[in-house]
Amino acid sequence: MVTYKDSGVNIEEGYKSVKLMKDYASKTFIPGVINNLGSFAGMFEIGSGYKNPVLVSGTDGVGTKLAVAFATKKYDTVGIDCTAMCVNDILCHGAKPVFFLDYIACGKLEAEVASDLVKGVSEGCSQAGCALIGGETAEMPGFYKEGEYDLAGFAVGLVDKDKIIDGSKIEDGNVLIGIASSGIHSNGYSLVRKLITDFNEEFNGKKIGEVLLTPTKIYVKPVLKVLESFDVKGMAHITGGGFYENIPRMFKGDFTAVINKESLEIPEIFKHIMSLGVDENHAFNTFNMGIGFVICAAKEDKDGIIASLKESGEKAYEIGYVKAGGSGVCIK
C-alpha cells in the first residue's frame, strides 16, 4: 500500500505543528474574534465602534531575508517581519489592523520550525494589536529544497470612511517626519546576501547574521496614537524601492518630497553595505536608510507629533518637506 507519507507529505507532522501553533495564535485574540482556530474560516465581528467602517487589506512576504534565517537556523523572528510588512502598509491609510492570516510553504514540514515561524507572526500581531485568526501550512515535496520555507501574511484593518488618509490633503510646505527603523527591515536582502556571505562575521560586537535578522519595526500603536490627536496628511512605509519609490506613493497631486540628507541619522549597517560597493543613490533606492515610516503633516503639528512619537518610545525627527510641482523625491 502506498501512503501520502511515501510521497513526502507527513500528516502527523502537520497535526503536531497545528497543535504547537494554536497556543501562539490564541494569545493574540482580541474582542471581535468569534471562532477558534481549526474551522474552515476565521471570523471577526466589526462591532459598533465605527460609523461607516471601511475594510483595508494588505499582503506581503518576508522575501529573501528568510535565507538568512535558514543559514543561521533562527526562525522565531522572521514571523514578526511578515506581520510588520502587512500591518505597516495598511496603517498608511489610517487603518487599525484587526486580524491577520499567515501562509507557510515548504518541501518537508518540521513542526518545530513551523511553530517558530508562527511564534514570530503571533508576536508581531501582539505588537500590532490584531488577532491571528487563521492560516495555511502547505507541505509540497520536491517544490522547495529541504530546510527552506516561504512565509507570507495577510492583514485586514478598519478605518472610518471619513478618516481615510489618502494624500488628498497634502499641501505645499507640509513637513515630513521620519520614524527610525530598527535596521534593514525586510527589503534589499538579495543585494545584501550578494555582498555578505559569512553570517558569522563580527559586526559591532555581534554576529552580522544576528544584525541582519533584527525584526522589522511595527509602527501601529504609536502612529494610531498620533492619529487620535493630529490631522495627518499622508503616510509612507519605507520598504522595497527605498525613499524614491515609497514616499511619492502618499501624494495624489504633483508634489516633490525634498529630503534633507544632513538630517538623516544613517545606521552603521547601511554604511557598511555602502562600503562594500553600493553607491549612495542606489542605497536610497533600495533600503530604508534608517527611516522606516514617514508622516506628512502641517508645520504647526510637527512638534506635537514628534513629542507623541517620542512618548511612545520612537525616535522621530523632521527629515524634509513637501514642495508643490514636479514629482518624486529630491535628496539634497
Swiss-Prot record:
- Name the record gives this protein: Phosphoribosylformylglycinamidine cyclo-ligase
Q: Which GO terms describe its molecular function?
A: ATP binding; phosphoribosylamine-glycine ligase activity; phosphoribosylformylglycinamidine cyclo-ligase activity
Q: Which GO terms describe its cellular component?
A: cytosol
Protein's cellular compartments: Cytoplasm
The gene name reads purM
Q: Which keywords accompany this UniProt record?
A: ATP-binding, Cytoplasm, Ligase, Nucleotide-binding, Purine biosynthesis
PANTHER family attached to this UniProt entry: TRIFUNCTIONAL PURINE BIOSYNTHETIC PROTEIN ADENOSINE-3, TRIFUNCTIONAL PURINE BIOSYNTHETIC PROTEIN ADENOSINE-3-RELATED
Family affiliation: Belongs to the AIR synthase family.
Pathway assignment reads: Purine metabolism; IMP biosynthesis via de novo pathway; 5-amino-1-(5-phospho-D-ribosyl)imidazole from N(2)-formyl-N(1)-(5-phospho-D-ribosyl)glycinamide: step 2/2
- Read off the CDD domains from this record: PurM
HAMAP family assigned: AIRS
